[in-house]
Amino acid sequence: MACPLDQAIGLLVAIFHKYSGQEGDKNTLSKSELKELIQKELTIGAKLQDAEIAKLMDDLDRNKDQVVNFQEYVTFLGALAMIYNDVLRG
């Protein structure tokens, strides 16, 4: 049986691949795929406006190829983990 951290990492990878490739490359998220992922998988996602999601996409897309690859997605998750840590620590 997998340890909780193994399961969590597997889930993060699975969520990326659940949304990636619906519109093209199966290893990247388009702007609309990222928007759907954020809105469906994060509590805060439903509260974000389109302009905020577009800004997030621009910030995440480090190489400016108009998609978010897995490395850019992991960077996003790291930033989210830092925010969650700050909230949980008070």
UniProtKB/Swiss-Prot annotation:
Per the record, membrane topology reads:
Peripheral membrane protein
The protein's UniProt keywords, in alphabetical order, are: Acetylation, Calcium, Cell membrane, Cytoplasm, Membrane, Metal-binding, Nucleus, Repeat
Q: What residues does Ca(2+) 1 bind to?
A: T28, E33
What subcellular compartments does it reside in?
Nucleus envelope; Cytoplasm; Cell membrane
Q: Which InterPro entries match?
A: EF-hand-dom_pair, EF_Hand_1_Ca_BS, EF_hand_dom, S-100A6, S100/CaBP7/8-like_CS, S100_Ca-bd_sub
Provide the GO MF annotations for this entry: calcium ion binding; calcium-dependent protein binding; S100 protein binding
SUPFAM superfamilies from the UniProt entry: EF-hand
Q: Which residues form the EF-hand domain?
A: 12-47, 48-83
Q: Does the keyword Transmembrane helix apply?
A: no
GO terms under cellular component? cytoplasm; cytoplasmic side of plasma membrane; cytosol; nuclear envelope; nucleus; perinuclear region of cytoplasm
The answer, when asked if Nuclease is one of the entry's keywords, is no
Location, primary (coarse class): nucleus
* Residues annotated for Ca(2+) 2 binding in this entry: D61, N63, D65, E72
Where, per the database record, does this protein carry N6-succinyllysine? Answer: K47
Source species, domain of life? Eukaryota
Q: Which residues carry this modification: N6-acetyllysine?
A: K40, K47
Task: Tell me the GO BP annotations in alphabetical order.
Answer: cellular response to virus
Role description: May function as calcium sensor and modulator, contributing to cellular calcium signaling. May function by interacting with other proteins, such as TPR-containing proteins, and indirectly play a role in many physiological processes such as the reorganization of the actin cytoskeleton and in cell motility. Binds 2 calcium ions. Calcium binding is cooperative.
Assembly, per entry: Homodimer; head to tail assembly of 2 subunits. Interacts with CACYBP in a calcium-dependent manner. Interacts with ANXA2 and ANXA11 (via N-terminus). Interacts with SUGT1. Interacts with TP53; has higher affinity for TP53 that is phosphorylated on its N-terminal domain, and lower affinity for TP53 that is phosphorylated on its C-terminal domain. Interacts with tropomyosin. Interacts with FKBP4. Interacts with PPP5C (via TPR repeats); the interaction is calcium-dependent and modulates PPP5C activity. Interacts with TPPP; this interaction inhibits TPPP dimerization.
The name of this protein is Protein S100-A6
Species per Swiss-Prot/TrEMBL record:
Sus scrofa
